[in-house]
Amino acid sequence: MTLSGSGKTRFVLKPNILQCCSKKYPVSFVVTDPKGSIVNESAHALVENGYEIRIINTINFHKSMHYNPFAYIHDEKDILKLVTTLMANTKDEGNGGNPFWEKSAKLLYTALIGYIHYEAPMEEQNFTTLLEMLNSMEVREDDETFKNPVDLLFDELEQKEPDHFAVRQYKKYKLAAGAIS
């Protein structure tokens, strides 16, 4: 659109929000507000017209409503969508990225999220569990037979269900990881 500081918020966004907020002709808004000023300056008018304001604050999570994308996973296709979104939004813009590492990360995320979705209790289906699993994936260069807690989880799941979606993804990940050791 235009450069930062050129008046988009003041002359375009805020007038449109205030003009469109009407009880007679209600519309919904999704607004990116990096400075937090738009909500402060337009919230009163929106609330007066019956709007419910929800805020996702990625800087201060204590001031944020919570959103758990795991709650929207219903099948393997949804797992793949979440992984693709996660990868796209955490990519380093200045780096082309090595396709091998990106594919390995995608396989690992797919396996772990698949495990969480199909095997974890509902209250553990979240990014906290994913991070805990990632943090417990210790590798010992001097001991090729060492198995970390995540390896053991997948071994146990494979014993029960050898063709489980998460197991298949984890085996592909381990195969790729083994190709570089």
What is each PLM-predicted segment?
Residues K106, T110-S181:
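Non-catalytic, charge-rich alpha-helical accessory subdomains
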Residues M1-I113:
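Switch/coupling segment of Walker-type NTPase motor domains
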